Design a protein with these regions (language model features):
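Active-site-adjacent alpha-helix immediately C-terminal to a catalytic or transition-state-stabilizing loop
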Residues: 141-149
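Active-site-proximal loop/hinge segments that shape catalytic or ion-binding/gating pockets
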Residues: 136
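Surface-exposed, flexible loop/turn segments at secondary-structure boundaries
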Residues: 52-54, 82, 116, 139
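Nucleotide phosphate-binding/pyrophosphate-handling subdomain across enzymes
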Residues: 1-72
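Structural beta-sheet core signal
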Residues: 46-48, 76, 133
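C-terminal helical cap/extension that packs against the catalytic core
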Residues: 13-14, 62-130
Length: 149
């Protein structure tokens, strides 16, 4: 669970992938490029949350790499804390990453919760569209705990 797992957000495809380092971010982006290879124009709504101490800039560069016909938009969210049994794990504040995303000319917002970000993502009714939750296995855990019903 939590690795290249397809779900649905209403009628919108939703991909869960815990991609939490540069290598897994590159693998996720390559997978998405393959999935969208025959789609001339598509939107990816990213819902991302990161642990403190991660190489976020490298992960963002891998995930948000420009491609003709592909439009990115990002919601940054924290994951729930404390992480059960791991009090040393801390979520990076979403505001700590906004400038890095915006420096890549990508629309970026922050939300206080995964639920709020999913509501925002579901309101997007443009071209072919997918939603991807990534950046932390703890964020994927939040999805299963709070929103899978």
């Amino acid at each position: 669970e939590g690795r290249c797992e397809w779900m649905e957000l209403g009628a919108v495809p939703l991909l869960l992938d815990g991609a939490h380092n540069e290598a897994s971010a590159l693998a996720l982006r390559q997978y998405l490029d393959q999935c969208l290879a025959k789609t001339p124009s598509a939107d990816i709504t990213w819902i991302m949350g990161f642990s403190c101490g991660k190489e976020v800039h490298a992960m963002l560069q891998a995930l948000l790499c420009p491609r003709k016909g592909l439009y990115h938009r990002v919601s940054l969210v924290p994951f729930s804390m404390p992480v059960e049994g791991m009090p040393w794990v801390k979520a990076m504040l979403p505001e700590e990453c906004t400038s890095a995303v915006r420096s890549m000319n990508v629309e970026c917002v922050t939300h206080d919760s995964l639920r709020d970000a999913l509501t925002w993502a579901s309101l997007h009714d443009q071209r072919p569209h997918i939603v991807v939750i990534c950046g932390s296995l703890y964020l994927i855990g939040d999805y299963y705990r709070q929103l899978s019903f």
